[in-house]
């Protein structure tokens, strides 16, 4: 089957990697897995051996192939396939999220996931995105800490995919347990986004500029005032916002 680069299609074909992903998800028969970007169904097949699966696939050619390949599971109600854009369709009920997602939608899809109710997610990302998600020296990593705990489980080589991507990938486990609590999430995310848009400036100056732009007075102590955004981490950002 000819794959479409416009959809970022890189099919996971390494059975050992697929097996480890399923293992990381710690699935039971009672689980319902949501898989975004089912592709040709290699991961889907392994998931269906463990539990029920709901898949979301945008490519109509892939949808046709999936319906043919898993017609028995569909007939038994073990596999439900939704054709559509995962960023636009409402997520159905699920307990765990397991997917090799299209890398081009990593950020919006991850935040959509984090705002839903789930027990555990095991996601294949581009390595660079995974490192930002699990780090604290960037906007994505800082904000994500207020939603979840995320850790890289392993790095996956391009040869595990068809066609091979130009970059390495990473399997990430996400547990919906916030590492940092923030009461005013809207203000926190606005301030973090603003700060990292001015990452070369020090926090004292950034707080001043934020006040001028939005009329919000934030408190920053002398020590933090001399630091740049990538030096703070989620907890220090939260301390600044709490002091507003």
Swiss-Prot record:
Gene3D superfamilies: Vaccinia Virus protein VP39. PROSITE patterns: RRNA_A_DIMETH (PS01131), SAM_RNA_A_N6_MT (PS51689). S-adenosyl-L-methionine binds at residues 10, 12, 37, 57, 85, 100. GO terms for molecular function: RNA binding; rRNA (adenine-N6,N6-)-dimethyltransferase activity. Signal peptide: none annotated. Its EC number is 2.1.1.-. GO terms for cellular component: cytoplasm. It is found in: Cytoplasm. PANTHER family: DIMETHYLADENOSINE TRANSFERASE, DIMETHYLADENOSINE TRANSFERASE-RELATED. This is Probable ribosomal RNA small subunit methyltransferase A. It comes from Archaeoglobus fulgidus (strain ATCC 49558 / DSM 4304 / JCM 9628 / NBRC 100126 / VC-16). The gene is rsmA.
């Amino acid at each position: 089957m000819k794959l479409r680069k416009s959809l970022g299609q890189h099919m996971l074909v390494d059975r050992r990697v697929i097996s480890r992903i399923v293992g990381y998800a710690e699935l039971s028969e009672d689980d319902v897995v949501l898989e975004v970007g089912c592709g040709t169904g290699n991961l889907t097949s392994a998931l269906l051996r463990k539990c029920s699966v709901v898949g979301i696939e945008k490519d109509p050619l892939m949808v046709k192939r999936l319906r043919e390949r898993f017609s028995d599971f569909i007939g038994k109600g073990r596999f439900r396939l939704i054709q559509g854009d995962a960023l636009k369709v409402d997520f159905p009920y699920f307990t765990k999220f397991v997917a090799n997602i299209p890398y081009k939608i990593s950020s919006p899809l991850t935040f959509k996931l984090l705002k839903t109710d789930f027990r555990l997610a095991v996601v294949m990302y581009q390595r660079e995105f995974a490192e930002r998600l699990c780090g604290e020296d960037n906007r994505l990593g800082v904000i994500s800490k207020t939603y979840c705990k995320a850790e890289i489980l392993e790095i996956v080589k391009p040869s595990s995919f068809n066609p091979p991507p130009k970059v390495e990938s990473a399997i990430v486990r996400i547990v919906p347990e916030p590492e940092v609590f923030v009461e005013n999430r809207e203000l926190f995310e606005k301030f973090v986004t603003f700060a990292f848009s001015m990452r070369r400036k020090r926090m004292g100056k950034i707080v001043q500029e934020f006040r001028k732009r939005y009329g919000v007075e934030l408190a920053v102590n002398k020590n933090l005032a001399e630091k740049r955004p990538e030096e703070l981490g989620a907890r220090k950002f939260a301390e600044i916002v709490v002091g507003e």
